[in-house]
Each structure stands twice: as structure tokens, then as C-alpha cells.
Amino acid sequence: MAGDDREPIGRKGRPSRPAKQKVTRRRVREEDYDDDYDDDYEDEKPMPRKGKGKGGKPPRRKRAWLWLLIKIGVVCAVLIAAYGVYLDQKIRSRIDGKVWDLPAAVYGRMVNLEPDMQISKNEMVRLLNATQYRQVSAMTRP
């Protein structure tokens, strides 16, 4: 096995492809051309370049979508703020309304009731009325 007489696996006698050369594409510059010749079209203006650069503006269609989304966002923000003001007014009217209309009462008179005390039903009703207790049809809490 002296020498280089071995073939790589998979080629089966075909020669290998030549390596691809890198294609260089460079931007055409105006300095590369000689514009010293005379022609009859001197009054024509050169066409502006349309290149995709990093510092250029985005296309018009993308800018239109961006402005549309900004406008929709502003409208949504205004609507949400208006709804928040409406809910705030509704909650404040409910808190300031019927919930807090009951007067606060201080029950400062202490009455000691004991099991062996002789007190009639009329006296107990008068005592409860004097301390501003209300009569209810059913108990809601113990």
C-alpha cells in the first residue's frame, strides 16, 4: 500500500468537483465610470438610487401599517380611560349612597341581665326601644 492509490468511499472512480470560487459582488460606484464623453442627453437628471440600506426609511406600506396601529392604540387607550372614569363614578355613587345612610349609634347604657332577675316583657321592650334597637321578623346572624 505504498503511494496514493486509494479511492475515497462513495466516489467510484469519478473525479471530484472543483471547489466553488466565491463570487464577489461589489456596489457600483459613480467614480468607477468615466463620464467625460459628450452626448445629446445632458439635460437628463440621473435616476436616484433605490437601495436597501440599514439607515434608510422603511417602505411606505410598513409605515402606513405602523401609523394605523398607533392610531388604533390611542383610540383604545382613550376608550379604556373613559370606561375607567365611568366605573369610578358608579362605584363612588354606590359607596356614597344607600350603604352608609344608617346613623352610627353608641350604645353606652349598660344593662346587666342575670338569670334570677325579675323583669317583665313590657320593661324589656321599653329598654330595647330606649337603646334604639329595631324589631326584625327573622334573625340573620347570631
UniProtKB/Swiss-Prot annotation:
- Superkingdom: Bacteria
Compositional bias ranges of the Basic residues kind: 11-27, 48-60
Q: Where is the composition biased (Acidic residues)?
A: 31-43
Q: Gene3D superfamilies recorded for this chain?
A: Cytochrome c1, transmembrane anchor, C-terminal
Segments for region (Disordered): 1-60
Give the Basic and acidic residues compositional bias ranges: 1-10
Pfam families, alphabetized:
PBP1_TM (PF14812)
State the name under which the record lists this protein: Uncharacterized protein in pulS 3'region
Q: What organism does this protein naturally occur in?
A: Klebsiella pneumoniae
